[in-house]
């Protein structure tokens, strides 16, 4: 299904207009709560919101690029910077959502054991590891696949390429023989692994909630807190990464599906702040996952 450039433009602009202020509010709310008590989930939320803020900043460029039918609108040397700032948060977001889900699952299934070892400094270490994994993998793959450098105008370049119509294109003119395996490796390591972790933790949270003493209403709230990350991964990041797999299996399936996947991925900047639930400016408000077990209560 092919969408018009005007519709792509409108979707990118809408994602930016909603996602940018939402993530600013999420950061504000998380910082306000962290001043009272810093928890592992607050650390993950802050990194996720900052990551989404970076992604949101690039969306106006994607909007102009879409309106120009893929032509690169900025000076040529900014292409590699844009690729890094746009795609690193897109892949890192899955890791932060998986970390949030793991924290909720461990708190629900093993409240006392997890309470004894949950320390914010461990969460900072996890976040640094996620960023390092994403950036190192991107640098390694992109560096190996660009033997002539980012601004080489050959067909194997990852950066600027000049197609037949004479307009410069950033990244999308990447040689398909190099792009397909590279994008597949990104998706397997940085999406499908976090997706499996998130799905496992979601099922574990549901089992723990089923045996908890919470009311039906609070069970629904806790189930949303646990399942929101899984839904965001599926709905926002799933189509883009599915297109990477599809284009590897059948090269003819990649083009328009990938463009749609980038659109849904951009809307993760809108859904993620709603999933984390730290939009309120007041430290005393916000959606938290609270699980009451046989011997006590744990709050994350």
UniProtKB/Swiss-Prot annotation:
Disulfide bonds join 79-170. The chain crosses the membrane at residues 9-31, 42-64, 80-101, 122-142, 179-200, 224-248, 257-279. GO terms for molecular function: bioactive lipid receptor activity; lipid binding. SUPFAM superfamilies: Family A G protein-coupled receptor-like. Keywords: Cell membrane, Disulfide bond, G-protein coupled receptor, Glycoprotein, Lipid-binding, Membrane, Receptor, Transducer, Transmembrane, Transmembrane helix. InterPro entries: GPCR_Rhodpsn, GPCR_Rhodpsn_7TM, GPR40-rel_orph, GPR40_recept_FA. One of its GO terms (biological process) is response to fatty acid. Residues 32-41, 102-121, 201-223, 280-300 are cytoplasmic. It is found in: Cell membrane. GO terms for cellular component: plasma membrane. The record marks 145, 172 as: Important for receptor activation. The gene is FFAR1. It is a multi-pass membrane protein. The keyword rRNA-binding does not apply. Belongs to the G-protein coupled receptor 1 family. This is Free fatty acid receptor 1. Glycans are attached at residue 152. Residues 1-8, 65-79, 143-178, 249-256 are extracellular.
């Amino acid at each position: 299904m092919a969408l018009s450039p005007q519709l792509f433009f409108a979707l990118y602009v809408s994602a930016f207009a909603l996602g940018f202020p939402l993530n600013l509010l999420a950061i504000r709310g998380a910082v306000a709560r962290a001043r009272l008590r810093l928890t592992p989930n607050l650390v993950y939320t802050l990194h996720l919101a900052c990551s989404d803020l970076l992604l949101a900043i690039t969306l106006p460029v994607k909007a102009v690029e879409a309106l120009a039918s893929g032509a690169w609108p900025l000076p040529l040397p900014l292409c590699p910077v844009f690729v890094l700032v746009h795609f690193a948060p897109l892949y890192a977001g899955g890791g932060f959502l998986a970390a949030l889900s793991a924290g909720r699952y461990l708190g629900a299934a093993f409240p006392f054991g997890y309470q004894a070892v949950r320390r914010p400094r461990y969460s900072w270490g996890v976040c640094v590891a996620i960023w390092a994994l994403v950036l190192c993998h991107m640098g390694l793959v992109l560096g190996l696949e660009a033997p002539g450098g980012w601004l080489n105008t050959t067909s194997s370049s990852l950066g600027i390429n000049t197609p037949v119509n004479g307009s410069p294109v950033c990244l999308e003119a990447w040689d398909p023989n190099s792009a397909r395996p590279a994008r597949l490796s990104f998706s397997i390591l940085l999406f499908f692994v976090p997706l499996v972790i998130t799905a496992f933790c979601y099922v574990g949270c549901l089992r723990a909630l089923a045996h908890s003493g919470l009311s039906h209403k609070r069970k629904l709230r806790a189930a949303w807190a646990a399942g929101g990350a899984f839904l965001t991964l599926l709905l926002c990041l799933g189509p883009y990464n599915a297109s990477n797999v599809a284009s590897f299996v059948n090269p003819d399936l990649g083009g328009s599906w990938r463009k749609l996947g980038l659109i849904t991925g951009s809307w993760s900047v809108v859904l993620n702040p709603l999933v984390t639930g730290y939009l309120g400016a007041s430290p005393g408000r916000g959606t938290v996952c609270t699980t009451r077990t046989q011997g006590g209560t744990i709050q994350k």
